[in-house]
């Protein structure tokens, strides 16, 4: 019973973390900082800055 409870808690934690990562993903250049670029949902520093 304890093992099942721990497994469920871990599954919920992983789901929350995945949800947070998806929320933070950028969709276009305006969501990143001035000198950053959006590539595949993440902001990376550009070489121009």
UniProtKB/Swiss-Prot annotation:
Leech salivary gland peptide with unknown function. Residues 22-27 form a propeptide. It is found in: Secreted. Expressed in salivary glands. Highly expressed in the head, body and tail with a 2-3-fold higher expression in the head. One of its GO terms (cellular component) is extracellular region. This is Peptide HSTX-XI. The modification Leucine amide is found at residue 48. The keyword Heme does not apply. Keywords: Amidation, Disulfide bond, Secreted, Signal. Residues 1-21 form the signal peptide. Does not show effect on voltage-gated calcium channels, potassium channels, and tetrodotoxin-sensitive sodium channels. Does not show activity on Nav1.7/SCN9A, and shows very weak activity on cation channel TRPA1. It comes from the Eukaryota. The keyword Flavoprotein does not apply. Disulfide bonds join 26-38, 32-43. Belongs to the annelide toxin family.
């Amino acid at each position: 019973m304890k093992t099942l409870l721990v497994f469920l808690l871990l599954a919920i934690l992983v789901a929350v973390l995945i949800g947070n990562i998806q929320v933070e993903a950028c969709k276009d250049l305006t969501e990143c900082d001035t000198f950053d670029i959006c590539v595949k949902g993440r902001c990376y520093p550009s070489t121009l800055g």
